[in-house]
């Protein structure tokens, strides 16, 4: 069996394409089942977010798996293969597994180390699992990817440093003034950046937040979400009088807060420090306001340097996670190799079970007066003996599948236990395919 992923993301496709090729919640269930029902596909999981749509499949032949997965995606959204293919990426085997681990860990995200994608992958997997479109391979692979991602985030701290300007603004405020719980904070602008800033402030413990915006309704919408108050931007001067922190992010073409506005506010503020953080481009606050006594003014360039430093830290942590991923995939590939001998193990267990049943039937004929309890006790002991006898042979055959001379070892094993030769042919074919895939990957890496 082979793992293939076909998809597109923010690196390969513009938003105009991504919004066309996106599975909504209402269609996800039907889509993942329909994908599994395509020719040559045995397991399927679909991950679809605003930044990516990815189809993971287990297939018996990589080339047919690729083709039918691409065709399914094009047909589902009413596109031709020619229209869709320029925006697609395709990974197979090791590369497909590595991609899943990187996505789940947040290493493939626009903001490296973000955790939202972890929940999205989990939801996609659980949906597929409930619909029984996953099996032996994906049940193990996705669980291991999720487990590694959780552990990596907990142990490396990759998500701790702010890497967006709005988050960096809040981090800077905490560094300079300490806890935000008792601070009066003014947010100017209720657009996407202003809303994200308000969210970050609220999550940092701020509860005295006032949002100013040209459109009062938009200010109220943002403020109400975070227990704040809202005012028209025309009332901003009153907000400056009591604010400890001002974070501004409007789309104005010129400065909306003049030096004299800050100077006037300072007359009523005693000796309290006044922190102004301007994350707008063009700038919202006149730069000369920072020259006033007690005023500390930072602009987007100051924050960009913080973001760059933090991103460098995240990339160091990301490198640690990459090494964990490599180790996890190597272990998973070893497990995949043993799948080729699963039919042999099953046959050996079936033979043992048949012997147990025949022996039990013989005992019942010779000892017709046995009670049900006696039969149960004897049956349990027979099963225990068989399991103990099989433990070493089963351990041997699993290890043998990963050895250089696996084919010879398995043939000897089959001959020893008088197992069906067709099972050996199936196992040998699977191991050859796995070896070819590994050899191809190593050749590419060289």
From Swiss-Prot:
User: Mind telling me which CDD domains this protein's record contains?
Assistant: NAD_bind_Glutamyl_tRNA_reduct (cd05213)
The protein's site described by Important for activity is found at: 99
State the remark under miscellaneous: During catalysis, the active site Cys acts as a nucleophile attacking the alpha-carbonyl group of tRNA-bound glutamate with the formation of a thioester intermediate between enzyme and glutamate, and the concomitant release of tRNA(Glu). The thioester intermediate is finally reduced by direct hydride transfer from NADPH, to form the product GSA.
Q: Which SUPFAM superfamilies match?
A: Glutamyl tRNA-reductase catalytic, N-terminal domain (SSF69742), Glutamyl tRNA-reductase dimerization domain (SSF69075), NAD(P)-binding Rossmann-fold domains (SSF51735)
Q: Which residues are NADP(+)-binding?
A: 189-194
Which PANTHER family does the record cross-reference, listed alphabetically?
GLUTAMYL-TRNA REDUCTASE (PTHR43013:SF1)
Catalytic activity line of the entry: (S)-4-amino-5-oxopentanoate + tRNA(Glu) + NADP(+) = L-glutamyl-tRNA(Glu) + NADPH + H(+)
Gene name of this polypeptide: hemA
Q: What is this protein called?
A: Glutamyl-tRNA reductase
Q: Which PROSITE patterns match?
A: GLUTR (PS00747)
One example GO MF annotation: NADP binding
Q: Where is the active site?
A: 50
Keywords noted in UniProt: NADP, Oxidoreductase, Porphyrin biosynthesis
What lineage does the source organism belong to? Bacteria, Bacillati, Bacillota, Bacilli, Bacillales
Species of origin: Exiguobacterium sibiricum (strain DSM 17290 / CCUG 55495 / CIP 109462 / JCM 13490 / 255-15)
